Amino acid sequence: MPHTVATPPPLLQVRGISKQFSGVVVLKSIDFTLQPGQVHALLGGNGAGKSTLMKIIAGILPPDTGVIEMNGQPCFNLTPAKAHQLGIYLVPQEPMLFANLSVQENILFRLPKHQADKKKMAQLLKNLGCHLDLSVSAGSLEVADQQLVEIMRGLIRDSHILILDEPTASLTPAETHRLFSQIRMLLQQGVGVVFISHKLPEIRQLADWVSVMRDGGIALSGATADFSTEDMIQAMTPEAQKGALTDSQKLWLELPGNRRAQSHAQSQQPVIHVHDLSGEGFAHISFHVQAGEILGLAGVVGAGRTELAETLYGLRPASTGNVILEEVNITAMKTANRLAAGLVYLPEDRQASGLYLDAPLSWNVCALAHDRQGLWTQPAQEAAVLERYRRALNIKFSHLEQPVRTLSGGNQQKLLIAKCLEANPLLLIIDEPTRGVDVSARSDIYQLIRSIAEQQVAIIFISSDLEEVVQMADRVLVMHQGEINGALSGAAMNVDTIMHMAFGEHRSASEPQGGTASSAENKGASC
């Protein structure tokens, strides 16, 4: 009688998982399987239920119904600590580090002594190609480096199931390549990876299997090679998205008391003129931005883009140089005065710096309002403002008093944009506006930014996604090691050229608006 070889059980099997919050169903009888050595990609629009499902698997939330099995054994009453013991580790979309602890302390936090192997940690860093200083405080790191620390926390715990929630959102192409190499090494050791991402090319490159969630259920699941990109997009967004904001949306989006309607609206002077500005992380920066122009700011992590943006907004001091906003020197102004003058900053980390997560939506959207006297104490006015942006930006929420942290990532980002617009900007600095948002929400945000520019607001657009920089910007400045390495426009503005310049290569470029093509030419000159 022939012997049959028993098929080993999946590393992880989820069956019939359901969940609701305050009567709203967010997961509908979900089935999900992860095999050893497999990358299972999870796609879905913001609010589809991806993060809720992963939090249940990681023991952060309890399911209402359903079963979770590891290696064929049911797991009951999961907690984060129990999930870690079982080898499940969730790397969150937004880094959740202890800002005042060192990088090393964060990686080893609450790790049993027999696992707290510093040599192993050093080897993992080497394998990842990281050059992190383990002694510095985690709060001093760029968002991309904070993300790598989170990943390290999972790797050093010998996780068998690694859940990566948008791990490459703030990584450069080189960092993404190193991360993927490390993931492939883990796969050879039998580790299973759940890979949540909105970057479809990455999913095709890395994932064996893909599942698409929509409205709390699984809309598509199977081998990645069996589905086209269009199949995945249609599964996420069943109704075709229009290419631009509707006339109704544009009407609701009209800025309150638009400063461009005032006497200086027809001025040919730049909205902002930065001359020979230096500060922590950058030096000798000069450029200008006209009304209605979208100026892209590209570069790898550590190039100084965010430091420059924070200095323009007054969060960091400038050591030399001048910043002129509408012919007024604001270099020595405090942040509040710059905001009142019309300079508004949308930060890259919406949860840490942009929104009050436990405050109501209606209060958040009015928090930066230029004239707030009595506004935040008048619920009717707050409600009217929020309703206007709900219609304009298609923000999805249940009620006005809903805490911000309960929104999906894409809706949080839209709310942050609404908060900035309510401040009535002359210049809007947008740092990583699509980090962690889905394909549909990205399209909404792109059209929104263009509509803002059409109202003659000047925009500085900072992004690590070079394709969206090329897609969105009228001109691009490329930063390398704190200086402008070149300025591009027109046909010269392409991903390949920007990439080479971001890594320090000098390339000639046509810049009809007075921009420069090298940092040497840029010093003291205006682009």
From Swiss-Prot:
Residues 510-521 have a biased composition (Polar residues). It is a peripheral membrane protein. Residues 12-240, 266-506 form the ABC transporter domain. One of its GO terms (cellular component) is plasma membrane. Its main location: membrane. ATP binds at G44, G45, N46, G47, A48, G49, K50, S51. InterPro entries: AAA+_ATPase, ABC_carbohydrate_import_ATPase, ABC_transporter-like_ATP-bd, ABC_transporter-like_CS, P-loop_NTPase. It catalyses: ATP + H2O + (2R,4S)-2-methyl-2,3,3,4-tetrahydroxytetrahydrofuran-[AI-2-binding protein]Side 1 = ADP + phosphate + (2R,4S)-2-methyl-2,3,3,4-tetrahydroxytetrahydrofuranSide 2 + [AI-2-binding protein]Side 1. It is found in: Cell inner membrane. GO terms for molecular function: ATP binding; ATP hydrolysis activity. Residues 507-527 are annotated as: Disordered. Keywords: ATP-binding, Cell inner membrane, Cell membrane, Membrane, Nucleotide-binding, Repeat, Translocase, Transport. Part of the ABC transporter complex LsrABCD involved in autoinducer 2 (AI-2) import. Responsible for energy coupling to the transport system. The complex is composed of two ATP-binding proteins (LsrA), two transmembrane proteins (LsrC and LsrD) and a solute-binding protein (LsrB). Belongs to the ABC transporter superfamily. AI-2 autoinducer porter (TC 3.A.1.2.8) family. NCBIfam families: PRK15439.1. This is Autoinducer 2 import ATP-binding protein LsrA. It comes from Yersinia pestis. The gene is lsrA.
